[in-house]
Protein backbone atom coordinates (compact mmCIF):
# COMPACT_ATOMS: atom_id res chain seq x y z
CA UNK A 1 0.00 0.00 0.00
CA UNK A 2 1.42 3.36 -1.07
CA UNK A 3 0.49 6.75 0.39
CA UNK A 4 0.60 9.56 -2.18
CA UNK A 5 0.79 13.21 -1.14
CA UNK A 6 2.94 16.36 -1.38
CA UNK A 7 5.01 17.53 1.58
CA UNK A 8 7.65 20.18 2.26
CA UNK A 9 11.23 18.94 2.38
CA UNK A 10 11.89 19.53 6.05
CA UNK A 11 12.44 17.64 9.29
CA UNK A 12 8.78 17.69 10.34
CA UNK A 13 7.68 16.14 7.07
CA UNK A 14 10.47 13.55 7.29
CA UNK A 15 9.25 12.59 10.76
CA UNK A 16 5.73 12.15 9.41
CA UNK A 17 7.04 9.96 6.61
CA UNK A 18 8.89 7.85 9.17
CA UNK A 19 5.64 7.43 11.09
CA UNK A 20 3.84 6.28 7.94
CA UNK A 21 6.59 3.75 7.24
CA UNK A 22 6.45 2.52 10.83
CA UNK A 23 2.79 1.73 10.24
CA UNK A 24 3.56 -0.30 7.12
CA UNK A 25 2.77 2.25 4.41
CA UNK A 26 4.94 2.75 1.36
CA UNK A 27 6.03 6.34 0.80
CA UNK A 28 7.69 6.23 -2.62
CA UNK A 29 4.72 8.13 -4.05
CA UNK A 30 5.30 11.19 -1.85
CA UNK A 31 6.67 14.22 -3.70
CA UNK A 32 8.35 17.24 -2.11
CA UNK A 33 7.50 20.88 -2.64
CA UNK A 34 5.99 23.89 -0.94
CA UNK A 35 6.95 25.34 2.40
CA UNK A 36 4.61 23.96 5.07
CA UNK A 37 2.39 21.08 6.07
CA UNK A 38 -1.31 21.61 6.58
CA UNK A 39 -2.56 21.40 10.16
CA UNK A 40 -5.80 20.98 11.99
CA UNK A 41 -6.60 21.62 15.63
CA UNK A 42 -9.19 19.57 17.48
CA UNK A 43 -11.12 20.72 20.52
CA UNK A 44 -12.48 17.47 21.94
CA UNK A 45 -16.08 17.52 23.06
CA UNK A 46 -17.59 15.92 26.14
CA UNK A 47 -21.16 15.08 27.13
CA UNK A 48 -23.39 17.66 25.42
CA UNK A 49 -20.47 19.85 24.21
CA UNK A 50 -19.56 19.14 20.58
CA UNK A 51 -16.04 18.66 19.30
CA UNK A 52 -14.73 21.43 17.06
CA UNK A 53 -12.06 21.44 14.34
CA UNK A 54 -10.02 24.43 13.17
CA UNK A 55 -8.17 23.92 9.88
CA UNK A 56 -4.90 25.63 8.96
CA UNK A 57 -4.28 24.32 5.46
CA UNK A 58 -4.24 27.39 3.23
CA UNK A 59 -0.96 27.61 1.32
CA UNK A 60 0.25 24.19 2.46
CA UNK A 61 2.24 21.87 0.21
CA UNK A 62 -0.83 19.78 -0.54
CA UNK A 63 -3.16 22.77 -0.95
CA UNK A 64 -0.84 24.08 -3.69
CA UNK A 65 -0.66 20.74 -5.52
CA UNK A 66 -1.25 21.10 -9.28
CA UNK A 67 -1.65 18.68 -12.20
CA UNK A 68 1.68 17.41 -13.50
CA UNK A 69 3.43 17.38 -10.13
CA UNK A 70 2.89 13.66 -9.50
CA UNK A 71 3.92 10.90 -11.91
CA UNK A 72 0.69 8.91 -11.69
CA UNK A 73 1.62 6.46 -14.44
CA UNK A 74 4.72 5.42 -12.52
CA UNK A 75 2.79 5.14 -9.26
CA UNK A 76 -0.01 3.10 -10.85
CA UNK A 77 2.33 0.83 -12.86
CA UNK A 78 2.05 -2.05 -10.36
CA UNK A 79 -1.15 -1.00 -8.57
CA UNK A 80 -4.61 -2.51 -8.71
CA UNK A 81 -6.61 -0.09 -6.55
CA UNK A 82 -6.67 3.71 -6.24
CA UNK A 83 -8.45 5.33 -3.30
CA UNK A 84 -8.99 9.06 -3.06
CA UNK A 85 -10.70 11.45 -0.67
CA UNK A 86 -13.03 14.37 -1.29
CA UNK A 87 -10.82 16.44 1.00
CA UNK A 88 -8.18 16.47 -1.75
CA UNK A 89 -10.62 18.29 -4.04
CA UNK A 90 -11.83 20.68 -1.34
CA UNK A 91 -8.64 22.65 -0.83
CA UNK A 92 -8.27 24.38 -4.21
CA UNK A 93 -9.28 24.25 -7.86
CA UNK A 94 -5.76 23.09 -8.71
CA UNK A 95 -6.17 20.26 -6.21
CA UNK A 96 -9.47 19.25 -7.78
CA UNK A 97 -7.81 19.31 -11.21
CA UNK A 98 -5.01 17.11 -9.85
CA UNK A 99 -7.66 14.67 -8.62
CA UNK A 100 -9.19 14.55 -12.09
CA UNK A 101 -5.75 13.94 -13.60
CA UNK A 102 -5.17 11.00 -11.24
CA UNK A 103 -8.63 9.57 -11.87
CA UNK A 104 -8.32 9.76 -15.64
CA UNK A 105 -4.98 7.94 -15.56
CA UNK A 106 -6.18 5.33 -13.04
CA UNK A 107 -9.23 4.72 -15.22
CA UNK A 108 -7.13 4.38 -18.36
CA UNK A 109 -4.80 1.93 -16.61
CA UNK A 110 -7.68 -0.25 -15.40
CA UNK A 111 -7.44 0.27 -11.63
CA UNK A 112 -10.37 -0.21 -9.28
CA UNK A 113 -11.24 3.28 -8.02
CA UNK A 114 -12.80 4.02 -4.65
CA UNK A 115 -13.85 7.36 -3.20
CA UNK A 116 -14.52 8.55 0.33
CA UNK A 117 -16.82 11.55 -0.11
CA UNK A 118 -15.37 13.16 3.04
CA UNK A 119 -17.35 16.39 2.92
CA UNK A 120 -15.82 19.05 5.17
CA UNK A 121 -17.83 22.28 4.96
CA UNK A 122 -15.05 24.42 6.46
CA UNK A 123 -12.62 23.48 3.65
CA UNK A 124 -14.72 24.46 0.62
CA UNK A 125 -13.65 28.10 0.32
CA UNK A 126 -12.51 28.69 -3.27
CA UNK A 127 -15.81 29.68 -4.84
CA UNK A 128 -17.17 26.30 -5.95
CA UNK A 129 -19.60 24.05 -4.11
CA UNK A 130 -18.72 20.49 -3.19
CA UNK A 131 -21.50 19.19 -5.45
CA UNK A 132 -20.26 21.23 -8.41
CA UNK A 133 -16.72 19.89 -8.12
CA UNK A 134 -17.28 16.40 -6.78
CA UNK A 135 -20.14 15.12 -8.92
CA UNK A 136 -18.01 14.82 -12.10
CA UNK A 137 -15.10 13.29 -10.16
CA UNK A 138 -17.26 10.71 -8.38
CA UNK A 139 -18.33 9.34 -11.76
CA UNK A 140 -14.99 7.51 -11.95
CA UNK A 141 -15.74 5.51 -8.80
CA UNK A 142 -16.36 1.77 -8.64
CA UNK A 143 -16.77 1.95 -4.86
CA UNK A 144 -18.15 4.89 -2.85
CA UNK A 145 -18.03 5.48 0.91
CA UNK A 146 -19.84 8.13 2.87
CA UNK A 147 -22.22 9.16 5.62
CA UNK A 148 -25.75 10.28 4.87
CA UNK A 149 -25.00 14.04 5.15
CA UNK A 150 -22.11 13.63 2.69
CA UNK A 151 -24.28 11.89 0.12
CA UNK A 152 -26.78 14.73 0.53
CA UNK A 153 -24.21 17.51 0.06
CA UNK A 154 -22.51 15.93 -2.95
CA UNK A 155 -25.20 13.87 -4.72
CA UNK A 156 -28.32 15.53 -3.35
CA UNK A 157 -29.79 12.35 -1.85
CA UNK A 158 -32.04 13.00 1.13
CA UNK A 159 -31.04 11.12 4.31
CA UNK A 160 -33.17 8.32 5.71
CA UNK A 161 -31.98 8.92 9.25
CA UNK A 162 -30.39 6.61 11.82
CA UNK A 163 -31.91 7.15 15.26
CA UNK A 164 -31.04 3.97 17.14
CA UNK A 165 -30.72 4.53 20.89
CA UNK A 166 -29.29 1.12 21.83
CA UNK A 167 -27.97 -2.04 20.18
CA UNK A 168 -31.42 -3.67 20.22
CA UNK A 169 -33.22 -0.75 18.59
CA UNK A 170 -35.71 -1.96 15.94
CA UNK A 171 -36.08 1.30 14.00
CA UNK A 172 -32.93 0.51 12.00
CA UNK A 173 -34.36 -2.67 10.49
CA UNK A 174 -37.72 -0.98 9.97
CA UNK A 175 -35.98 1.59 7.77
CA UNK A 176 -34.07 -0.93 5.63
CA UNK A 177 -36.43 -0.55 2.62
CA UNK A 178 -35.77 3.19 2.68
CA UNK A 179 -32.02 2.57 2.88
CA UNK A 180 -32.32 0.23 -0.10
CA UNK A 181 -33.94 3.06 -2.06
CA UNK A 182 -31.08 5.28 -0.91
CA UNK A 183 -28.50 2.85 -2.32
CA UNK A 184 -30.43 2.48 -5.55
CA UNK A 185 -30.40 6.25 -5.95
CA UNK A 186 -26.61 6.35 -5.54
CA UNK A 187 -26.16 3.84 -8.35
CA UNK A 188 -28.58 5.76 -10.56
CA UNK A 189 -26.55 8.94 -10.11
CA UNK A 190 -23.17 7.17 -10.46
CA UNK A 191 -23.76 4.35 -12.98
CA UNK A 192 -20.19 3.07 -12.67
CA UNK A 193 -20.59 2.49 -8.92
CA UNK A 194 -20.69 -1.21 -8.09
CA UNK A 195 -20.72 -0.86 -4.31
CA UNK A 196 -22.14 2.02 -2.28
CA UNK A 197 -21.29 2.01 1.43
CA UNK A 198 -23.06 4.01 4.08
CA UNK A 199 -21.69 4.29 7.60
CA UNK A 200 -24.37 5.32 10.08
CA UNK A 201 -23.82 7.09 13.39
CA UNK A 202 -26.25 8.41 15.96
CA UNK A 203 -24.58 10.63 18.55
CA UNK A 204 -26.42 10.47 21.86
CA UNK A 205 -23.69 12.64 23.41
CA UNK A 206 -20.13 13.49 22.39
CA UNK A 207 -18.97 10.29 24.12
CA UNK A 208 -21.91 7.97 23.44
CA UNK A 209 -22.46 6.87 19.85
CA UNK A 210 -24.23 4.07 18.02
CA UNK A 211 -22.82 2.72 14.77
CA UNK A 212 -24.15 0.59 11.93
CA UNK A 213 -23.35 0.21 8.23
CA UNK A 214 -25.02 -0.59 4.94
CA UNK A 215 -23.83 -1.82 1.56
CA UNK A 216 -25.86 -1.60 -1.64
CA UNK A 217 -24.49 -3.80 -4.45
CA UNK A 218 -25.99 -5.87 -7.27
CA UNK A 219 -29.48 -4.55 -6.47
CA UNK A 220 -29.17 -6.00 -2.97
CA UNK A 221 -28.90 -4.37 0.44
CA UNK A 222 -26.63 -5.76 3.14
CA UNK A 223 -26.46 -4.40 6.67
CA UNK A 224 -24.67 -4.92 9.97
CA UNK A 225 -25.94 -4.99 13.50
CA UNK A 226 -25.55 -2.01 15.82
CA UNK A 227 -22.53 -1.18 17.99
CA UNK A 228 -23.37 0.82 21.11
CA UNK A 229 -20.23 2.73 22.17
CA UNK A 230 -20.96 4.28 25.54
CA UNK A 231 -17.44 5.40 26.51
CA UNK A 232 -15.93 6.72 23.31
CA UNK A 233 -12.25 7.71 23.47
CA UNK A 234 -11.70 9.42 20.10
CA UNK A 235 -13.97 9.32 17.05
CA UNK A 236 -11.54 11.19 14.77
CA UNK A 237 -10.35 8.74 12.14
CA UNK A 238 -13.23 6.31 12.65
CA UNK A 239 -14.49 6.96 9.14
CA UNK A 240 -11.02 6.33 7.73
CA UNK A 241 -10.85 3.13 9.78
CA UNK A 242 -14.14 2.04 8.22
CA UNK A 243 -12.87 2.75 4.71
CA UNK A 244 -9.54 1.03 5.34
CA UNK A 245 -11.32 -1.94 6.86
CA UNK A 246 -13.70 -2.09 3.94
CA UNK A 247 -10.96 -2.07 1.31
CA UNK A 248 -9.09 -4.74 3.29
CA UNK A 249 -12.29 -6.74 3.60
CA UNK A 250 -13.16 -6.55 -0.09
CA UNK A 251 -9.67 -7.71 -1.04
CA UNK A 252 -9.44 -10.39 1.66
CA UNK A 253 -13.01 -11.71 1.27
CA UNK A 254 -13.70 -11.08 -2.44
CA UNK A 255 -16.72 -13.39 -2.49
CA UNK A 256 -18.24 -12.36 0.84
CA UNK A 257 -19.44 -8.76 0.90
CA UNK A 258 -21.29 -9.31 4.16
CA UNK A 259 -18.11 -10.35 5.95
CA UNK A 260 -16.23 -7.42 4.43
CA UNK A 261 -18.94 -5.06 5.68
CA UNK A 262 -18.84 -6.55 9.18
CA UNK A 263 -15.05 -6.24 9.20
CA UNK A 264 -15.20 -2.57 8.22
CA UNK A 265 -17.67 -1.65 10.94
CA UNK A 266 -15.77 -3.61 13.59
CA UNK A 267 -12.57 -1.78 12.60
CA UNK A 268 -14.38 1.54 12.85
CA UNK A 269 -15.95 0.66 16.20
CA UNK A 270 -12.54 -0.22 17.62
CA UNK A 271 -11.06 3.05 16.35
CA UNK A 272 -13.56 4.89 18.56
CA UNK A 273 -11.72 3.34 21.52
CA UNK A 274 -8.22 4.37 20.35
CA UNK A 275 -6.77 7.86 20.77
CA UNK A 276 -5.25 9.55 17.71
CA UNK A 277 -5.73 9.37 13.95
CA UNK A 278 -4.25 5.91 13.42
CA UNK A 279 -6.26 2.77 14.15
CA UNK A 280 -3.64 0.87 16.15
CA UNK A 281 -5.44 -2.46 16.29
CA UNK A 282 -4.57 -5.89 14.89
CA UNK A 283 -6.55 -7.92 12.38
CA UNK A 284 -7.12 -10.48 15.14
CA UNK A 285 -8.74 -7.84 17.35
CA UNK A 286 -11.13 -6.83 14.58
CA UNK A 287 -12.03 -10.44 13.89
CA UNK A 288 -12.56 -11.07 17.60
CA UNK A 289 -15.02 -8.17 17.79
CA UNK A 290 -16.79 -9.47 14.68
CA UNK A 291 -17.32 -12.74 16.55
CA UNK A 292 -19.02 -10.93 19.42
CA UNK A 293 -16.16 -10.53 21.90
CA UNK A 294 -17.21 -7.24 23.53
CA UNK A 295 -16.31 -8.03 27.14
CA UNK A 296 -13.30 -5.70 27.35
CA UNK A 297 -11.50 -8.21 29.59
CA UNK A 298 -7.71 -8.30 29.74
CA UNK A 299 -6.23 -10.85 27.32
CA UNK A 300 -3.49 -12.71 29.21
Language-model regions, residue ranges each:
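Active-site flanking residues adjacent to catalytic metal/cofactor-binding acidic residues
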Residues: 5, 115-117, 146, 239
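Short beta-strands and strand-loop turn motifs
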Residues: 81-87, 112-121, 148, 197-199
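Conserved post-catalytic alpha-helical subdomain immediately downstream of the catalytic base
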Residues: 206, 222-293, 300
Amino acid sequence: TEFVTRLPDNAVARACIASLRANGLGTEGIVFGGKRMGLYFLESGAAFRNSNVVYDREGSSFATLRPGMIDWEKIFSDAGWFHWSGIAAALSQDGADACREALEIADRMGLTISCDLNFRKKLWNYGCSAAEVMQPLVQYSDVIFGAEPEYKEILGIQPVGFKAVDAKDTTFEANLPAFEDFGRRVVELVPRCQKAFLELRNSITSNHNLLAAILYSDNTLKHTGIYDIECEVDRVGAGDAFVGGMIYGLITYPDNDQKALEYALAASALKNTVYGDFNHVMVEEVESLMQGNTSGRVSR
